[in-house]
């Protein structure tokens, strides 16, 4: 009984210490490139979304930051984003480790591979711009499935100020070659 009470109090204190997420527009003055998608964003089952044309970054600041931050790129085959199970659902765990966590809602490529990559790079820039505010020293990028492909591409095809300090890849797509 004491163990259940202790675990319940721990869960409640963790929930109370969690900070509210902050959502930022990735490109408040308009994105530098376009994916050509003009149809409205669609909310699909299980909090998946498609037709993303206005990317955002949702930040979950750690209550007791350790200096690390992770930008998560949800997967979805570059046609939709699995925002919960490959994004928002992991925020509490990362925050409990002292890691500021951010979920990137990136634009679909729609034949323009540079579009999601520019969103990933901009997310890293934004995290660094707010480094003092969120007590960040290192910014990493993480992704699952197609998001893992995007994360690894962002980590290897960077420009000044967009190179992540580390990467975490969950079952990433490593080839777009469908012949194998």
Regions found by a protein language model. Give the residues of each.
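Bacterial Sec-dependent N-terminal signal peptides
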Residues: 1-22
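N-terminal cap/lid segment of alpha/beta-hydrolase-fold proteins
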Residues: 19-65, 113, 178
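Short, solvent-exposed loop/turn and secondary-structure capping segments
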Residues: 37-38, 82-84, 153, 179-180
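Short beta-strand element of the alpha/beta-hydrolase
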Residues: 67-76
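A fold-wide structural signal in alpha/beta-hydrolase
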Residues: 69, 95-102, 166
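Short beta-to-alpha linker loops that shape the active-site pocket of alpha/beta-hydrolase fold enzymes
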Residues: 76, 105-109, 173
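Catalytic nucleophile-loop/oxyanion-hole region of alpha/beta-hydrolase
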Residues: 82-84, 89, 104-138
